[in-house]
C-alpha cells in the first residue's frame, strides 16, 4: 500500500494542515492501494502563493533555461517511466499494456510537442 500524505509546495515536501485522508481504490479489483491527504483550503492557499511567487521570477527566465528545464523533466520522466505505468495501472485499473503503450506516454508527448 502506498500512502502519499505530503504536498510538494515551494520546492519542498510539506505536511497537510489536516490529518484527513482519502482512500485510493483500484477500480479493477476494488482494493485499497493507498491513501492521499485530503488537503485543506490553507494547503491550497500555500500552493497558490508559492506558484504566484515562482512566476514572478520564472517569467523572466530565458528560452534556453526553459528548454533545459523541460529536457530535465523529460529525462526524469523517462527514467521513472515504469513507475508511471505501474501507478496508472493501479489507480485507473487499466491493463499494463495500455498504461505503457498509451497513457504513460501522454506526459512526454505533451512536452515534446
Predicted features along the sequence, with ranges:
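N-terminal Rossmann-like NAD(P)+-binding subdomain of aldehyde/semialdehyde dehydrogenases
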Residues: 1-113
